[in-house]
């Protein structure tokens, strides 16, 4: 589910909860909303409000951690790709085919993005990324080193290629983590309860209604940002692929 859809649904839910509170207020007898009753309602909603604030804070921290980890993984992927290319370049011209395969792998990944749905999707006769990195490793294993230096470079290239494959799948797995939906559902229920009590106690006038709608929009905006950051490779707030864009410009050079 897209982040904008999530934010929109939260806004609708909170707006409906406020409306329900206003409708209930209009139908309740006056003694149900006297000063003592309102004090009890405020005390009860204070508990729910505190829990909601804690839950929202945890979601923000979780989403920010996911986003930061994705940024680190992207830079790590770019560094390992460059390292693999340079190790193969030092080996000699025998690795030209493997270097070209590596460049095609990165170009394909950049064009398809980082979602789990596109990670290994073959098109026509083209291999998916998983097969591509295996092709690079197969070329490296088929090399016939002539001396100790080339044997060392071959072993190092195979080691780094394994790290590149591992990083690729880390990027994919982190890209599909998303939000803990059960946690988010409970949070939205708490927030809806809060906004229902706001409507229950609020006088019906344009100023109060406008403020309540703005508050609902603000909370929905926060949920939208959390949802967007929890999916770091898609959406408005996404991890830049600039490190890999920069890396691909250097691949294949002598």
Task: Give the location of each predicted region.
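Alpha-helical transmembrane anchor segments
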Residues: 3-29, 40, 172-254
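Structured inter-helical modules in multipass membrane proteins
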Residues: 70, 83-176
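Disorder-to-helix initiation segments
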Residues: 1-2, 6-9, 37-44, 67-70
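Juxtamembrane loop-helix boundary motifs flanking transmembrane segments in multi-pass membrane proteins
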Residues: 28, 32-39, 76, 128, ...
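Short extracytoplasmic/periplasmic juxtamembrane "stem" segments immediately C-terminal to an N-terminal membrane anchor
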Residues: 73-90, 240-254
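A generic, lipid-embedded transmembrane alpha helix
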Residues: 42-59
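Transmembrane signal-anchor/signal-peptide helices with a preference for the extracytoplasmic
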Residues: 54-75, 230
């Amino acid at each position: 589910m897209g982040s904008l859809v999530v934010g929109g649904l939260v806004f609708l839910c909170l707006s409906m909860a406020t409306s329900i509170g206003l409708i209930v207020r209009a139908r309740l007898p006056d003694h149900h909303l006297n000063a003592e009753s309102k004090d009890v309602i405020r005390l009860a909603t204070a508990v729910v409000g505190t829990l909601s604030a804690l839950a929202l804070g945890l979601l923000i921290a979780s989403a920010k951690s996911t986003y930061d980890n994705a940024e680190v993984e992207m830079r790590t992927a770019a560094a390992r790709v460059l390292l693999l290319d340079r190790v193969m370049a030092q080996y000699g011209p025998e690795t030209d085919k493997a270097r070209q395969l590596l460049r095609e792998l990165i170009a394909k990944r950049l064009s398809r993005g980082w979602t789990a749905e596109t990670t290994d999707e073959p098109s026509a006769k083209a291999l998916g990324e998983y097969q591509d990195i295996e092709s690079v490793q197969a070329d490296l294993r088929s090399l016939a080193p002539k001396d100790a230096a080339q044997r060392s470079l071959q072993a190092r290239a195979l080691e780094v290629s394994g790290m590149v494959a591992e990083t690729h799948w880390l990027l994919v797995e982190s890209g599909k983590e998303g939000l803990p939906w059960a946690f988010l559902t409970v949070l939205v229920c708490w927030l809806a309860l809060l906004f229902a009590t706001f409507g229950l106690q609020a006088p019906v006038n344009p100023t109060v209604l406008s403020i309540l709608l703005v508050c609902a929009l603000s909370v929905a905006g926060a949920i939208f940002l959390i949802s967007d950051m929890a999916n770091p490779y898609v959406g408005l707030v996404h991890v830049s692929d600039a490190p890999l864009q920069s890396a691909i410009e250097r691949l294949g050079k002598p």
